[in-house]
Amino acid sequence: MAALGRPFSGLPLSGSADFLQPPPAFAGRAFPPGAAGHDLAPRPGVRGAPSSPGGRTARGRVSIHCRKKHKRLAEDDECPVRKKRLTEAELGAVTDEWALGAHQGREGHGVNTCPSSLSMPSMLDVVCEEMDQTTGEPQCEVARRRLQEIEDRIIDEDEEVESDRNVSHLPSLVLSDTMKTGLKREFDEVFTKRMIESMSRPSMELVLWKPLPELLPEKPKPSSSPKNYRRESQAKHAAPGTAFPQRTEGLLEPQCADAPLYRSLEAATSTEEEMEL
């Protein structure tokens, strides 16, 4: 670059001594007078300059963390002592219950497990299952007890109604001796017992009626033999046949009486025609 005759803009052309001096390692800090070279050397680690953005973010994080810590301490100080004791007691009771449940589970299953190996979801599932079992059993018992009470109440009401009911209000069936003997002779005794038992209900009624012998005779009249039936039928057919020729003869007799009159009229007409000719 110098051979071409053009000055390099990155380097100062003046030969001042400031350019050759190294920049200070820690700007704005005064080192103690008796500090050695190894004390002045920078320590290992990444350190950002005050003007760099990395240094600014690091300082911002530290300040935010300090603020949060101070805020928590202030809130703890402002919290009343009674509230602190209550929260500590609740947390202690919860941890004791978890430890006791884990110990009982190890004794019941016979497996030596570390408390730290027990996960929170598994413990919660076990607790929920135990609660469901304890709440489900009483519900079944309560439902069974209610059903039993309802059944007992219904039975008691039926017994009271039957005891209060008077026997005279029920329908009665009076059977005569002849009817009893007839039923025993024709039917089985079990059937009669069932009939009588069915009459104990108020909605059942039985009416027995026997028609008079004049209306319905016991024995039908003997029918005529087939030969007599044929003779009667032939006689019935012959009677209309004899009556029919008599009627035909009566109709033909007037026609025969009118024949000579017709003949006389014809003779008279013929004589008149001859006279005209």
Swiss-Prot record:
One of its GO terms (biological process) is positive regulation of cell population proliferation. It is found in: Cytoplasm, Cytoskeleton, Spindle; Nucleus. Residues 26-37 have a biased composition (Low complexity). Residues 58-69 have a biased composition (Basic residues). Keywords: Coiled coil, Cytoplasm, Cytoskeleton, Methylation, Nucleus, Phosphoprotein. GO terms for cellular component: cytoplasm; mitotic spindle; nucleus. Residues 139-166 form a coiled coil. It comes from the Eukaryota. Interacts with CIAO2B; the interaction is direct. Interacts with MMS19; the interaction is indirect. This is Coiled-coil domain-containing protein 117. It comes from Mus musculus (Mouse). The gene is Ccdc117.
